[in-house]
């Protein structure tokens, strides 16, 4: 599917419309926030099937995995905020020092303004829309930037958002690096980014120009430590599940194992068994085996096979 791209000239216009909408006070009332959260929940339920179908087209992600790892997490977040937004927004009393008597102290939470949310491709529904829940709950507006590597999902999300919220409140902007650059040239009141450390640095540098607060959820490496006293069969099943979920394209998936030398052979045997139980003898035929997102990622993973000994598997099929 061809990538949809927003006209770069519209980015500043959308940003200005959202700032004006926020300053009008339209997002501030807690009852309005709760109503928007309820509308968001209804939208996710309405668009659940198209979202899951798009995840299948882009990533070969099964309905079961799409629901468990994406949609259900989003719905849970929305429902938590619906239940608690009233409590979270109430002023909180704090002790007042004697020197300030007879004054009283409170913490009053106020929305920052317009937020930019940039998400990656590996969990394109959850990682883009879960931060939006916080935006709505806090009384802000938002521009959402989905990944260009999952065009089907990005298009469905854009349609869902347009069907649910006005552009001056929540908008979706699509495109490649030039669009990212144009977005980061704008002044935002909050930036929420999930992705690579290299692009995270660019986000941080752009935010620093205006002292914009940022949340950076960056990728890394996740070791899994298995001691000689561990239940080998259970540990192997958990590692296999964690590494096969989303084909290992998860920031908290086990990246490498640190095993006690006395259990290495037994563990590897149990791990192979666990993978076969999950995906069968030919994972390509499994409906629950997600595909690698693009050619560059495939070639990078293929290169790992040359760096060590292949214990089992090791076949590639581009």
What is the meaning of each model-derived region?
Residues 1-106:
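N-terminal Rossmann-like NAD(P)+-binding subdomain of aldehyde/semialdehyde dehydrogenases
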